[in-house]
């Protein structure tokens, strides 16, 4: 498989991952994961190891009527990065996820970041516009 084909496959796997999560299709979600998948959130230092534990974490760890929309996926070889918008009860936040795939094309590592918005330093207000 060429690097171009691998890049397309990694991006497609990540798109399928988010589609399964949005649909709460935990069987399809789990099928995309390697048995030894590791999920980490550096900001909270949480780690979930193993497919069954990670599927359970998602199925039980996020109750409520939430939704997500993929904003962007960038992939290369067996790696991909996604940016999503996660919405629940009128509030939303963005998530950045880094994915690594194994040789079989299953997700083996996920590193998840949830950046919080913040006010910029006042000293540079004259150098930027706000949106």
Predicted segments — roles?
Residues 1-131:
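C-terminal and inter-domain tail/linker signature
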